[in-house]
């Protein structure tokens, strides 16, 4: 089972800032998604789970769920995606979260056209 490779991550503060400033922002019930073209062949994911979400255990669980959804659904090749989770994300099944991820990504794609 492939993991979450280093090349699939948004890692630098400058990259996050560019995505926040110039990317497309779409709100969903479980998270907010930012999307920006990266010029690469593969998509990259960044997760911004702040202390507002909860303690370390809660934040790590949210990040694990998001990474798993991204790993299973490589739907955005050529884009950097940053997800800011909400508390509601933790009360959702993985299947429902995948559906929400796909829907939010489609909504962001419609906004670029």
Residue ranges and their predicted role:
Residues 1-113:
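Positively charged, solvent-exposed patches that mediate nucleic-acid binding
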